[in-house]
Amino acid sequence: MANNNNPFSMSTMLNSLQDTEKKNPAVPPPPPPYGVVTLATPPGYAPPPPTYHPCPCGFCDETPSQWMFRLMTRSEEEDAAYPFKEFISKLSKTDLQGIASLLTSDPDYFLAIARNKNGSNRLQRLIGKSDDVDELICAAILYRFLHVMTDKHPSYVATRGLRVFAGKKKEFLCEELIRNALLIARDRHGCVALNEMLTDLDHPYYRNQLLDVVAHDALSLSHDASGNFVIQHALKLNDPRTTRNVALSLRGHCIDLSFKKYGSYIVERLLDANESVAVVVMELVESDGDRLMRLARSEFGNYVIAKALRVTQKRMARVELFRDLVQKLMPFLTFLRKSRGSNIADFLESVREN
């Protein structure tokens, strides 16, 4: 580590930052209204020009914040000369804390760096370097949690934090995630981040709580363009309790979902699980005949019914459900032959021949 008397050292830069903050203390803006997600670029922030100032100190004509923004967001080509990973490996814990303090000193500043692909990657590298660094980054994530979770590159920082943070930091992050899970699930970037967290969360209590929130709102999420991916993912986890809860939430709505592309994927997932197959098949058997025929001839519904037949035929414990479904469909055999339901007609004919 360079001596503090060196005007080009990191310590000198951090001391300069402290002097600047004493003269012009930063006052964080108030948090956004609860539930409001604003994805616009923070006012007053734009990436600085890519050309480096020739002065080796790096901040003669820049504030410490500008210097740090440029360091965090520079391109991979610019980083190759002196990689960020190597740079932070030579810093003391005090200097690392100083960097983290600068990066998190203003919520808009932190978010602007996190929205940059390279900035996001370098913030992720800082996570886990020390408990003090983690506390500062965790606090910054929590302060703008919805903004972070519903933006592509910032959400990677939060996901990394959930994997690495321990103790109260992880608990605070989990509690905020559970509190905002449904808003996040309905966002195109948020649903991806939420799925990652559902997979990675290694705290049984919070994981079950999060899955319960998702399962309880499975119906509304299943009809949402982004939320349906969260329900599909929750079912892929093969957690019996969650599968049962999702099935209970969707009971009576499986046929409606089966008419839609992504909804049919969810219903097919339910057919795969012992805990939920009966819920789907009973709804098919008890449905109005005309409605069942329309489903069997529909673009996506025919796959659901064909799968229901295959699944119940193979499972001895479901033989009664299989027989009931075949009897329900057999009167429509003629109508199914020359339609999207021809696969169902072929199956029924093979059963009748046997």
Language model feature labels by segment:
Residues 1-354:
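Eukaryotic gene-expression regulator signature that favors modular helical reader/repeat domains
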